[in-house]
């Protein structure tokens, strides 16, 4: 009690100490939070002061309109800008474009607004002085770079700022810098697929651009994530986009020469009290001083309107240094040139011979330059009768499923326009713009567009009713969702391996939701001669590997790519030619089979008969130590003897826990369990079982079938048959690895065939008219050795087996290397036929009748085969490919076959035979080269099961150990295995697979059972399992194509 009390006091003391520490930490956290709040409040106060200062500057700018005059005899337009002492004038001009985006960073880290370069009044250069004014975009938290950025980052920024090259881009993919590999993700911009952004200057050495999002965020942009939006036939210059935040520079649109387009990015709002596109502020934009657009006159003004004439004035354009030469102005009336004024004269014109009282005229002014004329609609106005503020001739063109282009004729190019879509304000279009591009619309939907004109100043010369008419409407409907657009720029190059080519393309433009023409893009398909040869399921994929074997089988010279979607496929892209050198098949390599190496065993070979030997190299590769009755040692997969091939690596069974069970005890357990089940079985069910057993398809095969030498006699499927070895000539059940299954390009419909034991497929070819084996020149049966010391002393069974296999006569006997089996260490008292080899490839195999097989999986010997000479000896193939096979498979489990005029070896566990109805059908399959993509598995299975009159036999096994796959199994797919307890009677269907597992049934549940946990029920004990029929005639369920592995206990 005393110790308990002391312990309690100690715990209470520790609890109090922990509470004290917790309180101290909480107080520290609160102090940190309060400090952060105070810091944020201070920043907010500073920003508010700067905002007020900027507002006062803007008021001054509204009162004093800036102007830009043309100076110099070289006809080079220069800005009328007050110069700072010691600062070259060219530096102002070169930095003007990017200063709008980035600004010249002042001493406090803020950005200079364009007002730094705007004169307040006067038409002549004043004394050099400049009053700095800084702009902080408070509503955009990342509108400027942090002051902590390194010097390299700042130098890159300065370099791009001075270049003046601005480009509009669209993000091809979404990108989160914090998920990327770079060490400074805060210096990069997050991207959203389909969104627009601006990049400055050239790409740096790391492949990044200096960029800015439409909300003002700036940072690095990976070049492979963006596409430039620029028409080679159009003059392009990007402008900043107007946003919902308090950006005081109005950014909007793309202006194209004679075809200006404003792109819709997102619903935006601009405070009309701040943004003024009229005469109150200098309307300077990137397109005004860009290199790719013809500068246009600004701010056309109606100075005087008379009955027969009008006087108009304008301001000269802003021409970047080195852009070109502006020679004169053209004054047009209704697109007809009335006069031409030389550059340097007064920017005013008197236009006569007009009837303004009865007619309406459109007056326009354009620049004549060495690089073409400017757009007349960027400097235009209407005069005369019935002039209203609203725009006219609204049109919607280029309507697609998700986009449309709106255009109009402005009453005055100084007016800005507000765009409404379905009565919701969408965006503001700046002055001198008359087109707008809608994106992200919904397919097959009606829209109503309203354009509201906003004059830069009230047109008092117009009557009230004409001033009030300030809007125009138009309606349109988008197209129904249709096929997506095809990919572009398709090319074919050499692939990663010699057996494939790489097809690359540029995906079509997608919306942020992954739509193309309103269709939900799911992937891309590669086609050759109208047949799909490859498919990739990824909306943003830009390439796929295509196996050359398919292209050669189709004799294709070019490929095309289609965009796949839920609404169908697109049209074919432009054909891409396949380089001829890639289509040339490699020269065939004749196979020289190495002589088989005799096998030895630790058993006395005299007990096994004259034809039974064990591979010495296999025995040498075994780890040291005794082998017990049901203990299993993993074989060494790296010590395969010379001359042997490995269709697929072996797998290892789980190990029983506890002491090993001796053979005597195992027999006793099996007998006791069998007798216990037999006593509890009902007589009626036992009678039914006996009737079904006696009526089985193999019951009387001994009496019905005779054997001619040297053929091996086929017996009924009794338990003794399976204890001594199968005589049905069945092909081993080969389980395929996950790598074969997952690489299937068509969902592996064909791979479902492998769920049927492959020995059944082979036996239906080998057995004729009641169970005879097809005649062959030699006897190809071979015995798999159970090289276990526990088999010593069972010479009677070994001798019996030896006698059976020395039964043949009248012809030469062929001996083959014995394939080492997992059962070699299990101490089982029956010999599994899973590794029996049916034949060896004869030198004249091509002279035998050809058989048609279909590939169940993709197979590339270079990457998938464990054999060193795979590239020369083995053939690659694709799932569904038709293969011509000569003869039976050899001792290593390989067929000799032909694909694309090349002979080589084919692993038996990767193909399945097809039974053609006649020669014409066989020729058709060979010409086609591949099974059609839509061939149902049921049709193939019916074909291969036709003529088969036997079912998979069943046997009874007793469990020697408890087995819970969730605890004892080292495999991933534990749900595929059965749970059982010691003494349970399990019905086993067919033979053991090469992994060492049976397919069995217990209490109505079916699954895989490790063979080293089971013991055969003795033949002299009659057992009837009421829930298991004597012959299992149904296909086992799909097995997960995963290699089974285990760890030693």
UniProtKB/Swiss-Prot annotation:
In its UniProt record, a GO molecular function of this protein is: voltage-gated calcium channel activity involved in regulation of presynaptic cytosolic calcium levels
Biological process according to GO = neuromuscular synaptic transmission; regulation of calcium-dependent activation of synaptic vesicle fusion; regulation of presynaptic membrane potential
Mainly resides where?
membrane
Q: Which CDD domains match?
A: FN3, SH3_RIM-BP_1, SH3_RIM-BP_2, SH3_RIM-BP_3
This protein's gene is called Rimbp2
Q: Which residues carry this modification: Phosphothreonine?
A: 841
Q: Where is the composition biased (Low complexity)?
A: 641-651
Family that this chain belongs to? Belongs to the RIMBP family.
- Annotated region (Disordered) at 580-664, 694-714, 728-750, 1024-1049
Q: What's the record's remark on domains?
A: The SH3 domains mediate binding to a proline-rich motif in RIMS1, RIMS2, CACNA1D and CACNA1B.
Which residues are recorded as modified (Phosphoserine)? 701, 709, 832, 839
Name of the protein described by the UniProt record: RIMS-binding protein 2
**Top-level lineage group:** Eukaryota
Q: Which ranges carry the Fibronectin type-III domain?
A: 294-387, 390-471, 486-587
This chain's function reads: Plays a role in the synaptic transmission as bifunctional linker that interacts simultaneously with RIMS1, RIMS2, CACNA1D and CACNA1B.
**Where is this chain compositionally biased, Basic residues type?**
1040-1049
- One matching Pfam family is fn3
List the source organism: Rattus norvegicus
Biased-composition ranges, Pro residues, are 582-598
Read off the Gene3D superfamilies from this record: Immunoglobulins (2.60.40.10), SH3 Domains (2.30.30.40)
Please verify whether the record's keywords include Phosphoprotein.
yes
Q: Which stretches does UniProt call biased (Basic and acidic residues)?
A: 603-616, 735-746
Q: Supply the alphabetized keyword list.
A: Cell membrane, Membrane, Phosphoprotein, Repeat, SH3 domain, Synapse
